[in-house]
A protein has these predicted regions:
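An N-terminal, well-structured beta->alpha segment
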Residues: 3-106, 197-224, 235, 493
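Gly/Ser/Thr-enriched, mixed-charge loops and adjacent short helices
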Residues: 12, 16-20, 36-41, 45, ...
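Conserved phosphate/anionic-ligand binding catalytic regions in large, soluble enzymes, centered on
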Residues: 41-61, 146-147, 231-243, 380-382, ...
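N-terminal small/polar loop signature for handling phosphorylated ligands or for N-terminal nucleophile
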Residues: 90-153, 243, 248-306
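Short Gly/Thr/Asp-enriched flexible loops that form oxyanion-binding sites at enzyme active sites
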Residues: 102-110, 152-160, 240, 302-322, ...
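Glycine-rich phosphate-binding loop plus the immediately following alpha-helix
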Residues: 159-187, 319-320, 324-348
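Phosphate-binding and adjacent anionic-ligand microenvironments
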Residues: 287, 291-293, 297, 306, ...
Length: 543
């Protein structure tokens, strides 16, 4: 076994076109480090609907030049099989380590495969790439990014010609095309590709501002708003400033330590606004400048977190606020959220007499909601992803969402209110919707399958003392590996994480609110019920 592994490693190295990666594998082979080689050769990175994502390291189980070369070749072969040879492909990249290199490698491979390749002019946010695919009429797009993953990761995200992420079976077909690709060193390359000008960012900025129509908020109200902001060491700052300026806002006060792109993300443990401590510097800045609202984007700026009054809002709270804002503006069509997101948005939509839809998890599904009669006009998921302008970007977009939050906050401030006040008003109108998670990390993945089997075979009949109905979402179309327990004012959805060895239960309880005085009591009761719901679900799962 050891000799076979060493031979496999040396064979991979011989076919690796990157000198540094080749030397890395050979050094491990020469040292006889079979434990590390087993990790590197445990199997190729899985190409899923979000593309590739993994640690930066040599070998088939890492993000490196050889893996990206074969991924680009597989993507090109799949596009060719669909009749797209000669079409345009747009490639973007963030500021993570080797992102620019992987973008260049992809351009060389796809150009040699017969595609008209254009690369974004510099590290830019993922929403700019998603916009460019549709704006330029490309047949596909590639974004080299690992979004909010740890610093040592990178990724390879693929968009179809409509500017949306892949859905099955395209991911499996591309994965098969990658597997059928020969050694990376033998993949043809060409320098016959181009670089887009800065006007692509300008076009994105103009499209976002046009879609959200800031002129509906008086100029004085926009200029009176104080916004604090952080890019979390990512690539969002420049584009976000341009959008805010074009919309008539003053420049946001930015966390200086986190403003410039830095692939080491030195001030945070994880560059994810959801993680504890990630927005501490933003909170301090917001207090220092007296910000009306504070916004944190993740490193590729496709998600954003909102802070008001020293409190970080949940994704469900922001999702409901933005839906309510658009509905009060008269934006009609389909409002969609993923099945693990909260229910308040649907209650608001129903009150306005508009269609709302629940989709499987992920923006790849949210963006496909809607009909000809009621096209998608808004979508969100609880993990801080929002689409306030799906006509511009068919994916989550933290920059346009940030502008939407600022416009909402400016409108409210003009009336002497804040976004927290509007949340209280929504609670009085619809009830207090309290959402949270039970998340269990495991070392042994069989614990997850065992827990799901236990829940399917013996689901609880009640939660919080209320009868609940059980639904196995694996039996629906499209099938989802999840179960739902739904009762009057209580809900639990349980599924394995798609990216981590975790089992997640998404929990919700609804507490009636009868008057202003009842808000505080309702929040206390909601917190208690959420704690009880966590305990009941942990017991039901045997965890």
């Amino acid at each position: 076994m050891t000799q076979d592994l060493l031979a496999t490693a040396r064979s991979w190295a011989a076919a690796d076109p990157h000198e540094g990666d080749r030397a890395e594998i050979l050094a491990l082979a020469d040292a006889g480090d079979t434990a590390e080689l087993e990790r590197r050769f445990a199997g190729p990175l899985t190409f899923g609907t979000a593309g590739l994502r993994g640690p930066l390291r040599a070998g088939p189980a890492g993000m490196n030049a050889a893996v990206v070369t074969r991924a680009a070749a597989g993507l090109g072969a799949w596009l060719a099989s669909a009749g797209h040879t000669g079409g345009g492909v747009v490639i973007g990249f963030d500021a993570r380590r080797r992102s620019d290199e992987f973008a260049r490698v992809s351009a060389e491979v796809l150009s040699a495969a017969g595609f008209a390749v254009q690369v974004l002019p510099r590290p830019l946010p993922t929403p700019v790439l998603a916009f460019a695919v549709r704006h330029l009429g490309a047949v596909a797009g590639v974004m080299v990014t690992a979004s909010h993953n740890p610093p040592d990761d990178n990724g390879y995200k693929v968009y179809l010609g409509d500017g949306a992420q892949l859905v099955p079976p395209a991911d499996r077909e591309i994965e098969a095309a990658i597997a059928a690709t020969g050694p990376a060193r033998e993949v043809p390359r060409s320098d016959d590709w181009g670089t887009l000008g800065d006007d692509i960012e300008t076009d994105y900025v103009d499209a976002v501002v046009r879609a959200l129509d800031p002129g509906r908020v008086p100029a004085a109200d926009r200029s009176a708003l104080t916004v604090a902001y952080t890019a979390l060491h990512g690539v969002g700052a420049g584009t976000t400033r341009r959008v805010f300026a074009a919309a008539g806002f003053g420049e946001p006060a930015s966390v200086p330590e986190q403003d410039a792109p830095d692939p080491a993300f030195p001030t945070v443990a994880f560059p994810n606004p959801e993680e504890p401590g990630a927005v501490d510097l933003l909170l301090a800045l917001a207090e220092r400048v007296g910000a009306d609202v504070a916004i944190a984007e993740d490193p590729d700026a496709d998600r954003c977190s909102v802070v008001c009054g020293g409190r970080q809002l949940t994704g469900d709270e922001v999702g409901a606020l933005l839906a309510d804002w658009l509905l009060r503006r008269g934006v009609r069509g389909t409002y969609a959220s993923s099945l693990v997101s909260g229910s308040l948005m649907h209650a608001i939509a129903e009150a306005h007499g508009v269609v709302s839809a629940e989709t499987p998890t992920g923006f790849k599904w949210i963006m496909r909601a809607g009909t000809d009669a009621a096209p998608l006009v808004y979508g969100y998921e609880e993990a801080l992803g929002y689409s306030v302008a799906p006509s511009v970007v068919r994916d989550k977009d933290g920059i346009s969402a940030a502008l939407g939050v600022a416009l909402l906050a400016a409108e409210l401030k003009a009336g002497g209110r804040t976004v927290l006040d509007r949340l209280d008003e929504l609670a009085r109108e619809h009830g207090l919707f309290v959402t949270g998670q039970l998340s269990v990390r495991v070392e042994d993945l069989t614990l997850i399958s065992d827990a799901m089997a236990r829940l399917r075979s013996a689901p609880p009949a009640t939660l919080l003392g209320r009868p609940v109905e059980f639904a196995d979402l694996a039996l629906e179309d499209p099938p989802v590996d999840a179960v739902r327990l739904l009762g009057d004012g209580v809900r639990a959805i349980v599924r394995p994480s798609g990216t981590e060895p975790k089992l997640k239960a998404y929990l919700e309880t609804v507490v009636p609110v009868h008057d202003d005085a009842g808000i505080i009591a309702a929040r206390g009761r909601g917190a208690d019920e959420l704690d009880q719901l966590r305990a009941e679900m942990a017991s039901a799962l045997g965890l």
